[in-house]
Amino acid sequence: GKMDDPVIFTKDCVSFIQPGDSSIGLKKGNKITLEQALYATLLASANEAAYAVGANVGKNAGHDYNWFVQQMNVRCKELGGNNSHFANTNGLHDPNHYTCARDMALIGRELFKHPEFFKIVQTLNYTIPKSKTVEKHEFYQKHKMLWPGGSYYYKYAVGGKTGFTSDALATLITMAKKGDTKLVCVVMRTHGRNIFPDTRHLFDYAFKNFKKTPVSGNETSKDVGEILADENSGYVMLPKGVKFSDLKMKMEVDKSMPSEAILTEAILSEVQERS
């Protein structure tokens, strides 16, 4: 969808909200833009906004909300995520809605390619202005590692998303960038605000102990030469002190996967073989 596409809130978009569910109070009949709905979803974790995004984008594509959810599952598998199944757009508990840290990290890695995502999540405060179709709504970024001056601020963090349900407990996905190294950290089933220092410690460990090594120019095998012809086609994170030449490659190609995911699996195989 386009950022200025209208998002209309039907009864289905709001009727499921229960006391304690994250919401900014959008109501049936409200009309905002897709951009405003994304800000409400990504900053304030507004469950009704997340539902409305799926319902309206699905409708505009000639389908419905359930079709949009199914596309989420399709896209996850395209990225190499094989241990997830999404049953809704907001993450509220459903026995058929599950994921894992690895799949969330794959999605987080993909988000680095979408600057519009970072424009939204790096916003600290946002207001949906009052209009004929909606009351004024003000909300803020819940990811405390993105707040300069805050006790949990992490200067290398560039984006992310918080999450909580009584079943899943606290979850957090965070993207960080230091120099030319980009990392994604996923922490799940954590209690309270421990999720922020836990994430920071994991990032600090990774930045301190691993280095980004391009595969192109280092891999000399003719079997993968064509795949790695593009110098930007891939890299591997190596423990500092380990040379690329120390690795022993094992190539396994799954033809059902897209080329990007195939390359990722090949690179991971090199590291795992060495370890």
List PLM regions with ranges.
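Active-site-adjacent loops and short helices of periplasmic peptidoglycan-processing enzymes
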Residues: 1-102, 111-114
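Domain-terminus/edge residues, biased toward the C-terminal soluble/receptor-binding domains
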Residues: 81-82, 96-98, 102-275
